[in-house]
Amino acid sequence: MYKRQRKDGAFIKLKNLEETEPYFYTLQTMVSRIVRHLPEIDNKYFDERKDKPAGEKTTGLIVVTADKGLAGAYNHNVLKMAEEQMQKAGQTGSYKLFVVGELGRQYFGHRGIKVAEQFHYTAQNPTLHRARIITETILEQFEEEQLDEVYIIYTNMVNSVTTEPQMLRLLPIVCLLYTSDAADD
């Protein structure tokens, strides 16, 4: 009986993850449409900070892991990609690590890797309020030039069996991503 409940719980978590995917892509499409119809944009969120030497830039890495449960490749591949990106960012400047999920916090903590900010139990029970807290933290540091670019590293659910780690640049916003023919309806 316990195994059945556990499998059902994992199935429900997987189903919930799959249900968020259309929202993510719809949001990207909406941003594309808005940016495409704007005149030349001069906004702090589009600032590439080209005047700042590469060695002085700080990269923010938001690493999304599970709080509990779904283990294995779901977390392992994201953590591996995060470590690769930390090494890469460390070679050309510095990085700040922001961790969503208890397993990521434990992973980096056991390795003595400094985490700038950790967001507990956000992966297990995401809410708009928790998303706003993360957003405000990141935007504040970007606006104050404590961060020069921000990436999110997460697990993409290809299907119910296959997952793959993904990395997406959040800041500065790359206007060309949203104005190219690829972004057309």
Whereabouts are the PLM-identified features?
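A short, hydrophobic C-terminal helix/tail in secreted or cell-surface proteins
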Residues: 181-185
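N-terminal assembly/interaction segments in proteins that build large macromolecular machines
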Residues: 3-180
